[in-house]
UniProtKB/Swiss-Prot annotation:
Family note: Belongs to the GCKR-like family. MurNAc-6-P etherase subfamily.
Alphabetical keyword list: Carbohydrate metabolism, Lyase
Enzyme class: lyase
Organism the protein comes from: Bacillus cereus (strain B4264)
Superkingdom in the source lineage: Bacteria
Protein's name in the database: N-acetylmuramic acid 6-phosphate etherase
Signal peptide boundaries: none
Gene Ontology molecular function, alphabetical: carbohydrate derivative binding; carbon-oxygen lyase activity; ether hydrolase activity
EC number: 4.2.1.126
Pathway(s) annotated for this protein in UniProt: Amino-sugar metabolism; N-acetylmuramate degradation
Family annotation (PROSITE patterns): GCKR, SIS
Amino acid sequence: MLENLSTEHRNEKTMNLDEMSIKEVLQSMNEEDRTVALAVEKEIEQIEKVVQTVIKSFEEEGRLIYIGAGTSGRLGILDAVECPPTFGTDDKMVQGFIAGGLKAFTKAVEGAEDREELAEEDLKSIGLNEKDTVIGIAASGRTPYVIGGLKYAQSVGASTASISCNKNAEISKYAKLNVEVETGAEILTGSTRLKAGTAQKLVLNMISTASMIGVGKVYKNLMVDVQSTNEKLVERSKRIIVEATGASYEVATEYYEKAERNVKAAIVMVLLQCEYGEALEKLKYAKGFVKKAL
């Protein structure tokens, strides 16, 4: 029942929200937001287990699939679409599904989140298999669409995890790993796009970033698999080569072009003074880890 969920409780500190000045509203929001990172901190060990599972999927050429409804679904898609430009993944490696389909990203699709079978259909459409990891996201922890997706994922042998913002969440029963970030009452009762949404975004940031580090997408703290899809990213790529090698901007640019815009290869070429082909071989042998290739 909704009344039993902490995310649905009224916040005692904001009972007079409609009487507050604009500044008081903003201060209240800021004060509540400060509690979110601390709530996430309590779930670090569980998040670590999720990351380890995702890395295993990636190593077996499996995928990371997010499923959610409303804000939760949008956050999953947001995290997924940032992976190709940031980490050089293809658009299948990390995917996000929202109840009601992509049109629900910009406009609510009434009733979609209440249908378990829609998630099964979505996951069947991509040929979900035992190598994949499915993460169900629901602030309330009770969304039928997410439960349906997790049930189907388990039936095909995929790894499963859940992210919710209530303890003992219903979706936790259908996932092997559970991240339950208890964010408590919102300043605006039941508006889980606020603290709960912030917590979900923090957890998703952790999962995707740490997992990509785990499969060699990062060298030191540089995103060396960045895709140069626009002018800003071309410049960033060159600067990454400068930072990683200590070379001048001109030398970095030269090797960036020699390496056919492959930042990892350019770094290896500069530091080992080798040709492009040799750099690629070293990276292949090192399974994409620049440090091992060196």
